[in-house]
C-alpha cells in the first residue's frame, strides 16, 4: 500500500465524512412518527448521555492506538483479546448488511422526488433491482479510498447543512407569524411516555446518534493524524447532536405527525413549508429530493466502505483468504467489499420476491437490525471498561476523565443499552416467537458460526505454532548433539 496515497484529507473533509456517516435526516422524521415531539428531548438525552461520551471513548481509543488501520478491532483486542475483537468487528459488519436493505428504498424514493416531483411506487422486485445497481455503484466508489469519499462527503455536508438551515429559519419565521404550528410545541407534547415501547424506540435514537466509530477507519488518511482526528470527532458529536435535537423540535411546524411517511417524510415537511410560504411545492420537492438523494447516497458510500475496513483490514492473517483481506493503495480490502456486495445482492433479491410492498420490505429489514445494531457499541463499551480497569497506564494524549469516572460513565451506558436493546428486540404487541426468531435467533446463529470460525483458526494457528516450535527445538538439539560428537 502506497503511503503517498494516505494522509490526504483535511479536517473539514473528515468532519464531512463523519457528518455523512452519522447525521441522517430521515432519523428525525422516523422517530417523530414513532414518538412525536417527545423525540426532541430524547435526542438531547441521547446526545448528552450517549453520543458525546461515546465520542470521548472513541477519541481515547484512537489516542491509545495511533497506528491502527481501522480502529475497532485494535480497540477491542488489547482489553478483551483476539477472539472478542474478531466477534465485535464481525457483528459490526454483519448488522450493516441488513441496514443497507432499509436504506436503499429511501435512496430510490428521493431519486423519484428529484426526477418526478413525487414518490413513484415501484414494486418490491423493481425496487430490489434498482437497489442492486445503486449498491454496485456505491461499492465501486467506496474502494477509491478516503480522498474520493472526502470530496463527495463535503458536497453532502454543504447540501445538508444548507437544507437544515433553510428549514430551521423557515420554521422560526412561521412560529413568529400569526399562523400557529400544525402541532403546538408544548411541554406536554415534548414529555415522553416512559414505557416498554418507548425504551425500544430509544434503541433507534441511540443508533441515529451513533456511527462516529466509522470515521476511525480513516485515521491514517487524516492530515495531522490522531490529534486532528480527536478534535474533529468531538466537534462533530456536539454539532450533530444539536442538529438532531433542534430538527426534532421543529419537525411538526408545517406537517402533522400523522401525515408523515417513512420513505418521503423529509420531502413532505419541506413541501409543507412551501405551501405555507406560497412557493411551488413540486419545485421544492424536486430540489429537496436532489439534495437528499445525494446525501443518502453519500452516507451509503461511507457505510459501504467503513464496516468492510473495520472487519477485514486488521484481523489476523489467515482468518480469511489472503486476497480477501488484501488492501489496495487506498487501504481498502477491495475483494471483501465485493463479497459484501454479493451478500447484499442475495438479500435484496430474496426481499424483493418475498415482500408484497416496499413498506413491508423496509419493515422486515428494520426488524432484522433492531436490537442487534446495539451489539457492536456494547463490545466497544465493555472493551473500554476493561481498558480503563486493566490498561489505564497505556500512553495516550486524551482521557475521558479519571479512571473511576470513565468506568462509571461507560457502566451506565452499558446498562441503558442492554435495556433498550431488549425492549427493541421484543416490542409490545408482537408474536414473541417470531420476534425471537428474527431479532435474536438469526443473529445468534451467524454469531455462533463466526465464533466457530475464529475458534477453528486459533486452534489451527496454535497447532502450527506448536509444530514449528517443536521442529525448531528438535533441529537445535540435533545440531548441538552433532557438534558435541565432532568435538
Region locations from a protein language model:
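Membrane-water interface regions at transmembrane-helix termini and the short interhelical loops
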Residues: 2-5, 63, 113, 133-156, ...
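TM-loop-TM module centered on a large, flexible mid-protein loop between adjacent transmembrane helices
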Residues: 74-75, 81, 235-301, 320-369
Amino acid at each position: 500500500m502506497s503511503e503517498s496515497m494516505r494522509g490526504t484529507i483535511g479536517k473539514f473533509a473528515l468532519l464531512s465524512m463523519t457528518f455523512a456517516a452519522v447525521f441522517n435526516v430521515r432519523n428525525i422524521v422516523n422517530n417523530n412518527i414513532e414518538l412525536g415531539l417527545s423525540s426532541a428531548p430524547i435526542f438531547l438525552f441521547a446526545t448528552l448521555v450517549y453520543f458525546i461520551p461515546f465520542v470521548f471513548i472513541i477519541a481515547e481509543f484512537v489516542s491509545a492506538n495511533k497506528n491502527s488501520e481501522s480502529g475497532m478491532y485494535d480497540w477491542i483486542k488489547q482489553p478483551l483479546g483476539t477472539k472478542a475483537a474478531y466477534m465485535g468487528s464481525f457483528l459490526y459488519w454483519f448488522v450493516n448488511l441488513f441496514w443497507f436493505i432499509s436504506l436503499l428504498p429511501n435512496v430510490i424514493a428521493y431519486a423519484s422526488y428529484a426526477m418526478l416531483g413525487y414518490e413513484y411506487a415501484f414494486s418490491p422486485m423493481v425496487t430490489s433491482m434498482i437497489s442492486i445497481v445503486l449498491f454496485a455503484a456505491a461499492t465501486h466508489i467506496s474502494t477509491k479510498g478516503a480522498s474520493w469519499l472526502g470530496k463527495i462527503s463535503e458536497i453532502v455536508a454543504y447540501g445538508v447543512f444548507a437544507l437544515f438551515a433553510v428549514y430551521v429559519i423557515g420554521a422560526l419565521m412561521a412560529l413568529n407569524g400569526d399562523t400557529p404550528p400544525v402541532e403546538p410545541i408544548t411541554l406536554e407534547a415534548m414529555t415522553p411516555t416512559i414505557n416498554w415501547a418507548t425504551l425500544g424506540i430509544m434503541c433507534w435514537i441511540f443508533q441515529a446518534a451513533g456511527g462516529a466509530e466509522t470515521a476511525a477507519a480513516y485515521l491514517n488518511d487524516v492530515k495531522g493524524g490522531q490529534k486532528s482526528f480527536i478534535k474533529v470527532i468531538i466537534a462533530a458529536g456536539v454539532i450533530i447532536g444539536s442538529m438532531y435535537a433542534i430538527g426534532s423540535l421543529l419537525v411538526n411546524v408545517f406537517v402533522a405527525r400523522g401525515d408523515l411517511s417513512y420513505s418521503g417524510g423529509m420531502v413532505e415537511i419541506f413541501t409543507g413549508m412551501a405551501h405555507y410560504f406560497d412557493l411551488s411545492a413540486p419545485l421544492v420537492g424536486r430540489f429537496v429530493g436532489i439534495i437528499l438523494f445525494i446525501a443518502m447516497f453519500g452516507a451509503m458510500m461511507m457505510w459501504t466502505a467503513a464496516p468492510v475496513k473495520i472487519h477485514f483490514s486488521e484481523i489476523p492473517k489467515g482468518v480469511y483468504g489472503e486476497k480477501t483481506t488484501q488492501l489496495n493503495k487506498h487501504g481498502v480490502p477491495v475483494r471483501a467489499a465485493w463479497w459484501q456486495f454479493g451478500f447484499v445482492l442475495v438479500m435484496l433479491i430474496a426481499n424483493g420476491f418475498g415482500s408484497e410492498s416496499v413498506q413491508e420490505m423496509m419493515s422486515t429489514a428494520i426488524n432484522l437490525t433492531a436490537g442487534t445494531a446495539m451489539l457492536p457499541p456494547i463490545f466497544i463499551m465493555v472493551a473500554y471498561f476493561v481498558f480503563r480497569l486493566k490498561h489505564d497506564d497505556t500512553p495516550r494524549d486524551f482521557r475521558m476523565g479519571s479512571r473511576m469516572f470513565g468506568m462509571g460513565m461507560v457502566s451506565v451506558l452499558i446498562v441503558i443499552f442492554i435495556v433498550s436493546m431488549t425492549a427493541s428486540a421484543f416490542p409490545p404487541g408482537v408474536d414473541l416467537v417470531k420476534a425471537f426468531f428474527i431479532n435474536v435467533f438469526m443473529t445468534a446463529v451467524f454469531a455462533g458460526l463466526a465464533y466457530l470460525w475464529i475458534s477453528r483458526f486459533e486452534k489451527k494457528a496454535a497447532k502450527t505454532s506448536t509444530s514449528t516450535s517443536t521442529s525448531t527445538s528438535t533441529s537445535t538439539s540435533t545440531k548441538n548433539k552433532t557438534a558435541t560428537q565432532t568435538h
